[in-house]
From Swiss-Prot:
Top-level taxonomy: Viruses, Riboviria, Orthornavirae, Negarnaviricota, Polyploviricotina
Alphabetical keyword list: Cap snatching, Endonuclease, Eukaryotic host gene expression shutoff by virus, Eukaryotic host transcription shutoff by virus, Host cytoplasm, Host gene expression shutoff by virus, Host nucleus, Host-virus interaction, Hydrolase, Inhibition of host RNA polymerase II by virus, Manganese, Metal-binding, Nuclease, Phosphoprotein
Subunit structure: Influenza RNA polymerase is composed of three subunits: PB1, PB2 and PA. Interacts (via C-terminus) with PB1 (via N-terminus).
Entry function: Plays an essential role in viral RNA transcription and replication by forming the heterotrimeric polymerase complex together with PB1 and PB2 subunits. The complex transcribes viral mRNAs by using a unique mechanism called cap-snatching. It consists in the hijacking and cleavage of host capped pre-mRNAs. These short capped RNAs are then used as primers for viral mRNAs. The PB2 subunit is responsible for the binding of the 5' cap of cellular pre-mRNAs which are subsequently cleaved after 10-13 nucleotides by the PA subunit that carries the endonuclease activity.
Family membership: Belongs to the influenza viruses PA family.
GO terms, biological process: cap snatching; DNA-templated transcription; symbiont-mediated suppression of host gene expression; symbiont-mediated suppression of host mRNA transcription via inhibition of RNA polymerase II activity; viral RNA genome replication; viral translational frameshifting
Cofactor binding summary note: Binds 2 manganese ions per subunit.
Post-translational modification comment from the UniProt entry: Phosphorylated on serines and threonines by host kinases, including human casein kinase II.
Superkingdom classification of source: Viruses
UniProt organism field: Influenza A virus (strain A/Ann Arbor/6/1960 H2N2)
Residues that, per the record, bind Mn(2+) 2: E80, D108
Keyword Metal-binding recorded: yes
Name of this chain's protein: Polymerase acidic protein
Length: 716
């Protein structure tokens, strides 16, 4: 084969092929088929470019004889055949002068007429299989692919063959001649069978042995091996094909694929009705903390001790009274419950030794608030099989609620910085590999951006409350245990701080199944007057319990202190996820990492430092009615974290449904923005599925409103 190559190809091509093989550490004495393939590919690239010029008027012309007077520019820039460094220099230069998008892999040519890079393929197999492998490897709409085979077939992106028929015929004839010459020397069969598919990163992880046999056995009919199936799936063109398949399925199935244009989508319809109300398990932006700095009291770290110490820092207690009643509740019971907490805390202080936990007396007000004896008696199903009118409870449809401005304010507040540090920089030991060094550097930069964030405070508060409540639910099943709502942080100066937000009283908690509910009453301090946004506090009874002196620009001012009381409930599975809220930090860090990776792959070096250090650069954060909002990288980190935290705090079936269904519409819109000419069927059904999830949940309604802003600006 080596002798044939040296006889059959131009010496310049042979020399370039030798260099290329040397660069990749391949021995042409052994890899003779590869040597022949490289020479063939080089020759096709040169023939593609030969005789094609652009004249002074910018028109593409074919000139077969050199005319020394003609001021002509080569139509194609040849990249194939250069050493890697030089080839990338040429590519970068083309991108800088023409504004073309930089390809991830080295292409073969650049077409100055069509302003696009071209990837040339020469295959001994079927052209469509090889085309799909190329497309799967390149994954770029911008690079044009043109495949030739030794049998005279060809395939190109969007059937755009770039060259005139005569130029292409010349290439096909040359390939056919090479094939015949090889066949006459008995070399063709070996050459034909030696072609391997395009190597992509994923395919280098070879599946072998039993797993390989299982993969090959598990293929759909008509596929001989995993590679063919992979190539088919990766290059699958759905439009048209789906339509045909559906029509074969059933006479009733009728799906006409409609083109999805800029004018096609309409905004998502948000429900009308009274404004939505707060439904989180604890107060967010409205919470007030009673704090102690540098705690060193006896029993420090025991929640009840810490809570009593924090309560002692406030001196403005007064006779409590209801300022905003709960419409459906017995408000005097909420008032009596708070008075009972104060009285029982006072009793503890009068004891010689403070106990580690406090179980509340089972008073009538607490029994009512915690739903004691309210659950209907359970009857074994076998005992009532014969009851003729056995049926489920009639339950009312939930009332539709409209979006209210308070949830956007809550989100904005969650993105802000506080004056405390809520998470420590984890020390995980020395890095032993370069990748560990990059990973810990990214983690440290990210931690620095979010450690002061209010969303991080919500994480630590959520972790503490859920852990304490789950522990108490298991350890004191029959007791009405008093659980302080506590968090710990550091001041800017590094001093430790313990904060008390209020109290929870837990009801009976015989939790056998993950979804069994434990009721609790929450009592939380706040300076927010509930009468300003009464719709937000529909589920709460709010008491005024004291006056707090605050420092302001005009000196000390007195502000009323409120207590937000409500009955609530949670389950083992919800508490388990609440305890794991730190995962939100990981999720948002991974999103930032993918942004850094994208930037690093373009620049071909790790961009972590530049990413966080370049304070002048702004990044897109989200959509608002004003347009695309931008901010610093720190703001992006905090916004992504806040979104993740709110997904946890406001988790619900409505959110699950909206996220899954709206994502489908988002993907279609993204495809339209990428000029992929998407098609859809039953778009009305998709809108129905999305809008079915918009009932009364504030976080879902806000996300739907953001989605509408995105639609408006994405389709301009």
């Amino acid at each position: 084969m080596e002798d044939f190559v040296r006889q059959c190809f131009n010496p310049m091509i042979v020399e370039l092929a030798e260099k290329a093989m040397k660069e990749y550490g391949e021995d042409l004495k052994i890899e003779t088929n590869k040597f022949a393939a490289i020479c063939t590919h080089l020759e096709v690239c040169f023939m593609y470019s030969d005789f094609h010029f652009i004249n002074e008027q910018g028109e593409s012309i074919i000139v077969e004889l050199d005319d020394p007077n003609a001021l002509l520019k080569h139509r194609f820039e040849i990249i194939e055949g250069r050493d890697r460094t030089m080839a990338w220099t040429v590519v970068n230069s083309i991108c800088n002068t023409t504004g073309a998008e930089k390809p991830k892999f080295l292409p073969d040519l650049y077409d100055y007429k069509e302003n696009r890079f071209i990837e040339i393929g020469v295959t001994r197999r079927e052209v469509h299989i090889y085309y799909l492998e190329k497309a799967n490897k390149i994954k770029s709409e911008k690079t044009h692919i043109h495949i030739f085979s030794f049998t005279g077939e060809e395939m190109a992106t969007k059937a755009d063959y770039t060259l005139d028929e005569e130029s292409r015929a010349r290439i096909k004839t040359r390939l056919f001649t090479i094939r015949q010459e090889m066949a006459s020397r008995g070399l063709w069969d070996s050459f034909h069978q030696s072609e391997r598919g395009e190597e992509t990163i994923e395919e280098r992880f070879e599946i072998t042995g039993t797993m390989r046999r299982l993969a090959d056995q598990s293929l759909p009919p008509n596929f001989s091996c995993l590679e063919n199936f992979r190539a088919y799936v990766d290059g699958f063109e759905p439009n048209g094909y789906i339509e045909g398949k559906l029509s074969q399925m059933s006479k009733e199935v009728n799906a006409k694929i409609e083109p999805f244009l800029k004018t096609t989508p309409r905004p998502i319809r948000l429900p009308d009705g009274p404004p939505c109300s707060q439904r989180s398990k604890f107060l967010l932006m409205d919470a007030l903390k009673l704090s102690i700095e540098d705690p060193s009291h006896e029993g420090e770290g025991i929640p009840l001790y810490d809570a009593i110490k924090c309560m002692r820092t406030f001196f403005g207690w007064k006779e409590p009274y209801v300022v905003k009643p709960h419409e459906k509740g017995i408000n005097p019971n909420y008032l009596l419950s708070w008075k009972q907490v104060l009285a029982e805390l006072q009793d503890i202080e009068n004891e010689e030794k403070i106990p580690r936990t406090k179980n509340m007396k089972k008073t009538s007000q607490l029994k009512w608030a915690l739903g004691e004896n309210m659950a209907p008696e359970k009857v074994d199903f076998d005992d009532c099989r014969d009851v003729s009118d056995l049926k489920q409870y009639d339950s009312d449809e939930p009332e539709l609620r409209s979006l209210s401005s308070w949830i956007q304010n809550e989100f904005n507040k969650a993105c802000e910085l506080t004056d405390s540090i809520w998470i420590e920089l984890d020390e995980i030991g020395e890095d032993v590999a370069p990748i560990e060094h990059i990973a810990s550097m990214r983690r440290n930069y990210f931690t620095a951006e979010v450690s002061h964030c209010r969303a991080t405070e919500y994480i630590m508060k959520g972790v503490y409350i859920n852990t304490a409540l789950l522990n108490a639910s298991c350890a004191a099943m029959d007791d009405f245990q008093l659980i302080p709502m506590i968090s710990k942080c550091r001041t800017k100066e590094g001093r430790r701080k313990t904060n008390l937000y209020g109290f929870i009283i837990k009801g009976r908690s015989h939790l056998r199944n993950d979804t069994d509910v434990v009721n609790f009453v929450s009592m939380e301090f706040s300076l927010t007057d509930p009468r300003l946004e009464p719709h937000k506090w529909e589920k709460y009874c709010v008491l005024e319990i004291g006056d707090m002196l605050l420092r302001s620009a005009i000196g000390q001012v007195s502000r009323p202190m409120f207590l937000y009381v409500r009955t609530n409930g949670t389950s083992k599975i919800k508490m388990k996820w609440g305890m794991e809220m730190r995962r939100c930090l990981l999720q948002s860090l991974q999103q930032i990492e993918s942004m850094i990776e994208a930037e690093s792959s373009v620049k071909e070096k790790d961009m972590t430092k530049e990413f966080f250090k370049n304070k002048s650069e702004t990044w897109p954060i989200g959509e608002s009615p004003k347009g695309v909002e931008e901010g610093s990288i720190g703001k992006v980190c905090r916004t992504l974290l806040a979104k993740s935290v709110f997904n946890s705090l406001y988790a619900s079936p409505q959110l699950e449904g909206f996220s899954a269904e709206s994502r489908k519409l988002l993907l279609v819109v993204q495809a339209l923005r990428d000029n992929l000419e998407p098609g859809t069927f039953d778009l009305g059904g998709l809108y129905e599925a999305i809008e079915e999830c918009l009932i009364n949940d504030p976080w879902v309604l806000l996300n739907a409103s953001w989605f509408n802003s995105f639609l408006t600006h994405a389709l301009r």
